[in-house]
Amino acid sequence: MTQKDAAFHIERLLKFALKKGLIEELDVIPSRNALMDLFKIEKPYEGEVPEEELDTPSPILNKLLDYGVEIGLIEDTVTYRDLMDARIMGLLMPRESEVVRKFNEIASKDGIEKATEYFYELSKASNYIRMDRTSQNLYWRTPTEYGALEITINLSKPEKDPKEIEKAKKIPQSGYPKCLLCIENVGFAGNLNHPARQNLRIIPVKVAGEQWYFQYSPYVYYNEHCILLHEEHIPMKISEKTFVRLFDFIDQFPHYFMGSNADLPIVGGSILVHEHFQGGRHTFPMEEAPIEEYFIHPKYKEVKAGILKWPMSVIRLSSKDREKLTKLSSHILNVWKGYSDESVDVLAYSEKDGKIVPHNTITPIARFNKEGEYEIDLVLRNNRTTDKYPYGIFHPHEELHHIKKENIGLIEVMGLAVLPGRLKFELEEIRKILTGKEKFNKDMYDENHPLYKHLHWIEELIVKYGTHCTEEEAENYIKQEVGNKFLQVLLDAGVFKRDEKGKKAFEKFMETAGFKKLS
């Protein structure tokens, strides 16, 4: 690629940035100069630049990255290309203060919904949300007795090259930023161990009298998947304050739900070291789940309460009275934290090395329901392990690890499976077996083979469906069976099982918390 070609792609990118509102007319010349400096280009392209309708800058960025490789600016690996494309887009971004000013102006003039729309579009146009990757994720819905569960196979996090992994290990850790959620990520250039964030912008939001910040997730597992993060690097903690914060947020952003991962290992999310919530604009299967048993608490008669028909153990509370809802949520949390019932393997505490270890916590999700009431789902969690279940008693059991072994966090709890990218290839190979394109003999697979972990499952599928399916049949069967596995994952994670014994144990807990069952 010549310098002239690269200069042409810079003009395309400037047009894109102008069209998407990243820059204004007065910014074109300085932005051009900054990009020319980055790529060591001596003069701009002077020919005609055709009009384009692009949703993302990726097609243009890929050309400029190729040029960067050619001139020795970067190595040709996924990580170096990612570091460079964030750097390129960082040169086209409005400053943090400008974004916040515009967000607040739109919110006061046209309402918060329009403001989040602006910010979401900005996050996509800046390539912070890599829509070219997230659009590759596989997605389907699987009907079950609990409604249609949502399944995604996550292809948006590219695999790192083994050489890069080795190289990254040798880089000294600076400890700055402390984690991926710290506010110091805004504008950070990144390195082999930490993604570049020159194209990240965040919006300050006050909740519970504290300073928090609002941004979108770069991986958008669902529509307008957002993150609310504490200004300080403090660990996750579920307490009464959590409920105040969640309700404060939805008061300001009523079109979004907001939830928190649990604050204990195994049942929590992947980042426990930084207090944060996740929300967005998506109706999850759990939200549509009906209440199967109604309860009332004599001290909180203004609050409707019930147990959800859901594979995990969920108490739903709703009320117009936010204060009462907060107090009752806090009461349930405190009772649950100290609650044990050995008959169903629930122990609130254990002792390790002379220290008391807590096991019970909650995954809370707040929203406004269709009646305009505050609504909160409290998902009861327990992270105890035993010799029989070293990964967790209420965690996907080992026979499901071939599909999902990671923590069951907030997103999965609500009925959306985020499954590892390796499954795309593995499920395609299994489909070939069900259609007869590949012969199956379990002795063909040693433990290093990608299908080895699925052998027992493949045998079950062959018994059930045979090896003469059409392509379409095989695909549908596999999707249904993966959905069934995810349902089993959620059932494993539920503390009170869905059988008679589990239902009675759940009712006993509700009684302990002071609830009366409504017949």
Curated annotation (Swiss-Prot):
Annotated family: Belongs to the galactose-1-phosphate uridylyltransferase type 2 family.
Biological or metabolic pathway of the protein: Carbohydrate metabolism; galactose metabolism
EC top class named in words: transferase
Keyword entries, A-Z: Carbohydrate metabolism, Cytoplasm, Galactose metabolism, Nucleotidyltransferase, Transferase
Lineage top rank: taxon: Bacteria
Organism of provenance: Caldanaerobacter subterraneus subsp. tengcongensis (strain DSM 15242 / JCM 11007 / NBRC 100824 / MB4)
GO cellular component, one term: cytoplasm
Listed HAMAP family: GalP_UDP_trans
EC numbers: 2.7.7.12
Intracellular or extracellular location(s): Cytoplasm
Pfam families the record matches: GalP_UDP_tr_C, GalP_UDP_transf
Any GO molecular function: UDP-glucose:hexose-1-phosphate uridylyltransferase activity
GO terms for biological process, alphabetical: galactose metabolic process
Coiled-coil blocks: none
Gene field: galT
Catalytic activity annotation: alpha-D-galactose 1-phosphate + UDP-alpha-D-glucose = alpha-D-glucose 1-phosphate + UDP-alpha-D-galactose
UniProt xrefs under PANTHER family: DUF4922 DOMAIN-CONTAINING PROTEIN, GALACTOSE-1-PHOSPHATE URIDYLYLTRANSFERASE
Protein name as catalogued: Galactose-1-phosphate uridylyltransferase
